[in-house]
Structure formats: structure tokens, C-alpha cells
A protein has these predicted regions:
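Sec-dependent N-terminal signal peptides
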Residues: 4-15
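A "functional boundary" signal
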Residues: 20-336
Length: 336
């Protein structure tokens, strides 16, 4: 029991393993993509290829490299559309890092492109991300201000994606500051404003957060429809674009973890175990360590509820060396 408590203490303090250690295989793969780009004519052909690579690799260690290369190539070719796309993907990289200063830089870049690309969506979506980054640093008042400012600007510019992103960020700021009712109101308002133009990533994120708030409040009957819709939305986009599946892995894991918690709370351990086995298959090297962490914790909870203490000890023996010897960072906050 003491070993279990030590591991859980370490995990909840945020010490996690660098599952994304850049091995030689990853470097070779990355280099091979860039070499192909170099062989293409320095025209729209090369830009389109780099855009596709950035789109398909929105996860570490490739997202920063391919986004940067797209942005730099677009600048060389003086192509505003692709330069804007590169800046958008770079902003997304810093969104994942919860880095408000770097995000702000790229948001300013995106704002300058609005008149050239003819849409406010890219700029406003990433401006909303600044609010989430601020909330992760516990700068709540500033986070709420940025989210509300982005929301008003999105309404003024008729930007659906900007509006959904702003409601999402506003809800996150309220959630971090222990205001679940206000958070839920913001997320539900985002949901009510879904349209055919709303990006799938924004839809999935909102559905996840609504399910989370209802789940935390013990309102399973209200949670399940949003969780099922999240699952269905994920499977639809993955079936349409299977080459982008790794972009969605973190969301898939999040969805499965929510199912596991639901069925454990219902004491349906057979179905909960089925989802545990399913989620373990998703733990590939590109997965964000936070989600890896959540899966380890959920398995420990499952074994505790089913009195499988031997399996708890075996799991601890398996993951403790990785956690203790290879952690590289401490997250200020987990996924809301």
C-alpha cells in the first residue's frame, strides 16, 4: 500500500515520463519528409505538400518542424495564404505547450493576415487559445477578459469558429477557478452554436468538456448523450481521414477514460475492463504524457475497486521506473 501511495503522490504532483523521446526512427522519418519537400519545385506544389504534412502531423515531435517549414517556405514564396496556415499551425503548437507569450506573438501575425486571407477564423480561434494558456497559469481574471473580448470580436466578425473557441476558453477559465455552473453555461452555449462550419476539433473539445462537468457532478444521464456524440464525431472524422488518426489520439483516449469512469461508477466492471483494454491500445509514443498518466491512474482505480491488488502492484512495478527516472516536466494543470 505504501508503494501505491508513493506512486500516486508522484503522479499527481505532475512528474511524468517523456514518452515522446525523439528516437532515431522519428528523426529519420522527419528528415525523409523534408527531403521529399526539397525535391519538389519551389512553387505551389511544394507548399501544398508541406501543408499536407503539417495537417497530418499535429502532434510532437513533428508538429513544430513541419509547421515551421511550411511557414518559412510560404514566406520565401510570398504566399500569404500558406504563410497564414503555417502561422496558424505554429500557434497551435504553442497552444499545446500552454505558452501565452508565444501564442500572443503568432496571434498578432495571424491578425495581420486577416485582410489577405478573407477570414477571421484562424486569428480568433488562436486568440481564444491565449485565454486557456493564461488559465493554466492561474491568471484567471486575465483569461476571462481575453475570452470575453474574443467572443465579442467573433460575434462582430461573424466568426463561428472564433465564437465556439471563445466560449470554450471562457468555460475553461471558470472551471479552473472552481465555478462549474458558469463553466457549463459557457460550454452549452458553444454547443448550441455548433454549425456545419464549426471545426471538428472544436466540437469534440466542447463535447468532452460538457461530459466532464456533468460527470463530475454525478449527472450520468445528462453526461452520456454528449459522451456518445463525442465518440461518434471522433469515429466519423477518423473514418473519413484515416491518415490523420494520430491527431485525434488524445481525444480518443479522453473519450475512453470517460467511458471507463462511467462504467466503474455503475459497477459494470466487465464493460469498464473492455474500455481499459481498448484505451491501452491507443498508448502509442506520440500520445501526450498527460493522457498516458490518466490511463495509468484509471487502471489503479479499477484494480482498487475490483480488489485486484496483485495487478495493482504489477502495474506499479511496470510504470514506476519510467515515471521516476524519466520525467521531464511538471504540468501546472491537467486537462479540464
Amino acid at each position: 500500500m505504501k508503494r501505491i501511495l508513493i506512486l500516486i503522490h508522484v503522479l499527481f504532483c505532475g512528474y511524468i515520463c517523456p514518452l515522446l523521446a525523439e528516437d532515431t526512427g522519428a528523426v529519420r522519418y522527419q528528415d525523409s519528409i523534408l527531403k521529399v519537400a526539397d525535391t519538389l519545385p519551389a512553387t505551389l506544389v511544394r507548399l501544398t505538400y508541406l501543408r499536407d504534412m503539417a495537417y497530418k502531423h499535429q502532434y510532437a515531435p513533428y508538429n513544430m518542424t513541419f509547421s515551421t517549414r511550411l511557414y518559412e517556405e510560404a514566406r520565401r514564396q510570398k504566399n500569404a495564404f500558406y504563410e497564414n496556415m503555417g502561422a496558424y499551425y505554429l500557434a497551435a503548437c504553442y497552444d499545446k505547450k500552454h505558452d501565452p507569450d508565444s501564442l500572443s506573438y503568432w496571434v498578432d501575425v495571424l491578425k495581420d493576415f486577416v485582410s489577405q486571407v478573407g477570414t477571421y477564423d484562424y486569428y480568433l480561434e488562436q486568440k481564444a487559445a491565449i485565454s486557456r494558456a493564461l488559465a493554466s497559469k492561474r491568471q484567471i481574471e486575465k483569461a476571462v477578459y481575453v475570452a470575453k473580448e474574443t467572443l465579442e470580436e467573433s460575434k462582430l466578425r461573424h466568426s463561428n469558429n472564433g465564437m465556439i473557441a471563445a466560449y470554450n476558453s471562457l468555460g475553461c477559465a471558470y472551471g479552473v477557478s472552481s465555478r462549474p455552473n458558469e463553466a457549463l453555461d459557457a460550454f452549452l452555449e458553444a454547443y448550441r452554436n455548433f454549425s456545419p462550419q464549426t471545426k471538428t476539433s472544436l466540437k469534440v473539445d466542447i463535447l468532452s468538456r460538457i461530459a466532464q462537468v456533468y460527470g463530475n457532478g454525478g449527472k450520468d444521464s445528462l453526461k452520456l448523450p454528449y459522451l456518445h456524440e463525442m465518440d461518434m464525431t471522433l469515429q466519423t472524422v477518423i473514418s473519413k481521414e484515416p491518415e490523420t488518426r494520430k491527431n485525434w489520439s488524445n481525444f480518443e483516449i479522453d473519450c475512453e477514460v470517460k467511458y471507463i469512469l462511467h462504467y466503474m461508477n455503475q459497477k459494470n466492471f466487465t464493460v469498464a475492463h473492455e474500455h481499459i483494454e481498448k484505451v491501452k491500445k491507443l498508448l502509442e509514443p506520440h500520445v501526450d504524457p498527460v493522457f498516458w498518466l490518466n490511463v495509468q491512474l484509471i487502471q489503479l482505480q479499477y484494480y482498487a475497486k475490483t480488489d485486484e491488488y496483485d495487478k495493482s502492484i504489477a502495474l506499479i512495478d511496470e510504470v514506476t521506473p519510467t515515471v521516476l527516472n524519466n520525467y521531464v516536466s511538471t504540468f501546472a494543470t491537467l486537462i479540464n
